[in-house]
Amino acid sequence: MKAKKKATGFEDMAIIPPFLSIQECISAPDFENLPSSPFSQKGITMRRSTIVFCVALFLAVANASVLGIDFGTQFMKIAIVRPGSPFEIVTDLSSKRKTPAAVIFGDSTRIYGFDALTLGARKPKNVFMRMSRLLGQGPNSDVAAEFKELKFPYEFKLTDRNTWAVKFPAGTGFDDIDYLTAEEVNAMILDYARNMGVLFDNGQKIVDCVVTVPSYFTQHERQAILDAASLVGLNVLSLIDETTAAALQYTVNKEFINKTHRVMFYDMGAGSIQVSIAEFHTLIDKKTKLPKRYFDVLSKAWDENIGGAYLSQVLADKFMEDFVAQHGLDPRGNAKVEYRLRALGEKLKEMLSVNDKLPVNEGTLFEERDLATTASRQFILDNSEPITSRLVAPALKALEDAHLTIVGATAPCHA
């Protein structure tokens, strides 16, 4: 990227370890100057599986192991740092490095992760997913419409605090529960993340954690995730902005001697798009004569109402239409069918990243009838214009705010 005009007004600067104390690099949750615009914010704060690096910086203020939770809309990744030991990625019992942020209720039990998704195919109203989207949302939020658009069978209501709660399914053995607040559901998932860390750490107690949050989170949303963590006894050392943490991770094992290096970090998740632009450089300390690496976050931008889940739904809607055309039966509104097609759309979307066209066969989808069709990358491209037309805008906004312009052309890459 080439500078059109020197950016000014960025007094905050991050210095990269090992040449700095962590208090200078990352601050505890700060509710001042949080995003109020739905689109962009200049400033500096901290990202995702990169959380493992950020967590390591907090050992200086913690007396025991610190848990890092990359708390995404669809999945979460967990890392642990022990005193005197390098950080490690926490894997589940199947050695998978990411875990669905999901919980299912039934028979007086709670089941999490991939097992929850598997059981959800049979009881889709009992499995709660994407619950982080509810955090801090008020009465004017369109979050309920978002779940409806993606064919989730949830019922919502406003609480006395004007936040959202989700209807609890009947017949699960938890007869005293009618609704669960957003904080309560997310607290359960955060507690599961902590329990995974405890199991990975041979039963050692874990209290302290660092949690990633989207750049666009407001004070209310940040407070909501802190409240969720406190419900299960987790002490949040810091909330870290996802794309800024990615910029921090980018500096590891890199030198920027005698040059300024500018990088755009573009993160398209399941529920939102986030972009940040950072400027990296190295200066020589006058006292120690040692190099110190610095970076400024020049700008941030986002679209918090679009993400990969909407592309998956393009395929799910196609499969539904194909089934109706083949059999003359219309299972729209059937929670089990819509759950299976949404999962199928997610799977095929990923496979079409490296394939042009694939056969699709889903047995016994509805009333003993099978779905037999095809899915192609071209179909997604032809039918997702309302989505894809919004993908570039945050990047352009970030460039504008940073007074930068792109030099060069694009290159295709597989997702």
Feature locations, PLM:
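Short, low-complexity interaction segments enriched in Ser/Thr/Pro/Gly
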Residues: 1-3, 12, 20-21, 30, ...
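Classical eukaryotic N-terminal signal peptides for Sec-dependent ER targeting/secretion
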Residues: 2, 29-30, 34-54
